């Protein structure tokens, strides 16, 4: 006799509709192929990109069907196809499910995926967190950890003890992962962070060697002072911007090594900080400064990138959590029924770490 269950999901239809909980019957014995697994989702994390995409979901562009939220997940495999090699029923897993306006997201009861096509999946790491269980912790890290890892490794740089990195937006969840990977895995010699003055103590504990405040005088002058007084006038090999900033472009040659040394400016969002509660599409468009980044006008190596699904960062994240070398920052945890409160917390821009929704 086949087993049918209710599969709830938080969905929206377009940028004018409010998110709602929908439910449909799912036959656990016939809903998957021989190459797929069915995961009972225990926890899912929210990311600002969820609300950015919702804001741009015009009906004429994305259609009228239901769209879903979230990409990070943790849970338990309850069905596995005959051709699935690395996962079996009973395995506890976490991962990143990539989709764009998909009918399936991770803010649901059950997730069906092919581990070959969605390779960012691993066994659940034993976190040993003092406050949160392993499902909550493991839902909080895949997207931000993967983004940080690829920002450090995707552009041909050999970073290590002699390297110097500047992180713009030191307190974000991505930068939280970034500094822990840089210091604990790559053994980068010097990481300088930019954050609010009140966040200095917290970020120092994560591993930043020096910090500059964006809310206490000129942040550009503060960074230049650090270069002169603490770095022996050596410029940065990598500037990593996780928030959207243009402060340093006017003096890029004073802070970033020559492009011939494969120095890189890596950005996640472009030149402007995005307001995720009411984003504007033109805020993400390149400005005149972009002419200095490409073709014959290129003055420095610049990369605006998005995370690609990959098993490599999941393997490393699992190892680092298990070895107590990385712990994601968690701001708050909400129940599935309180998803609206969780959404507002993310859109407030006041969360200090990941917002996680506990489903089971």
Swiss-Prot record:
GO terms for molecular function: oxidoreductase activity. GO terms for cellular component: lipid droplet; mitochondrion. PANTHER family: ALCOHOL DEHYDROGENASE RELATED, RETICULON-4-INTERACTING PROTEIN 1, MITOCHONDRIAL. Belongs to the YIM1 family. Coiled coil: none annotated. Signal peptide: none annotated. This is Protein YIM1-1. Keywords: Lipid droplet, Mitochondrion. It is found in: Lipid droplet; Mitochondrion.
């Amino acid at each position: 006799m086949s087993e049918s269950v209710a599969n709830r999901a938080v969905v929206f239809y377009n940028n004018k509709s409010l998110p709602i909980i929908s439910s449909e019957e799912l036959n656990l014995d016939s809903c998957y192929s021989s190459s797929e697994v069915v995961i009972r989702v225990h926890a899912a994390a929210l990311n600002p990109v969820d609300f950015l995409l919702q804001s741009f979901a015009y009906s004429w562009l994305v259609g009228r069907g239901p769209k879903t939220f979230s990409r990070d997940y943790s849970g338990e495999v309850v069905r596995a196809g005959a051709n699935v090699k690395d996962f079996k029923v009973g395995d506890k897993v976490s991962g990143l499910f990539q989709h764009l306006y998909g009918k399936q997201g991770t803010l649901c009861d059950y997730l069906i995926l092919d581990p070959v096509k969605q390779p960012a999946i691993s066994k659940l790491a034993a976190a040993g967190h003092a406050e949160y269980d392993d499902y909550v912790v493991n839902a909080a890290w895949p997207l931000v950890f993967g983004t940080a890892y690829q920002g450090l490794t995707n552009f041909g740089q050999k970073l290590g003890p002699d390297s110097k990195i500047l992180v713009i937006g030191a307190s974000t969840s991505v930068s939280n992962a970034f500094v822990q990977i840089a210091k604990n895995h790559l053994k980068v010699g010097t990481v300088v962070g930019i954050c609010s003055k009140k966040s200095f103590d917290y970020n120092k504990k994560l591993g930043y060697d020096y910090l500059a405040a964006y809310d206490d005088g000129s942040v550009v002058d503060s960074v230049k002072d650090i270069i002169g007084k603490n770095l022996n006038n050596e410029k940065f090999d990598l500037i990593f911007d996780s928030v959207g900033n243009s402060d340093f472009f006017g003096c890029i040659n004073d802070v970033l090594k020559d492009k011939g040394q494969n120095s890189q400016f890596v950005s996640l969002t472009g030149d402007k900080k995005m307001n995720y509660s009411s984003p504007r599409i033109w805020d993400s468009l390149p400005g005149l400064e972009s002419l200095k980044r490409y073709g014959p006008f290129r003055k420095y190596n610049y990369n605006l990138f998005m995370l690609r699904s990959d098993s490599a960062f999941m393997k490393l994240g699992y190892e680092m959590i298990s070895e107590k070398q990385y712990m994601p920052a968690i701001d708050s945890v909400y129940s599935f029924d309180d998803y609206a409160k969780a959404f507002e917390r993310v859109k407030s821009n006041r969360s200090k770490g990941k917002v996680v929704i506990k489903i089971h």
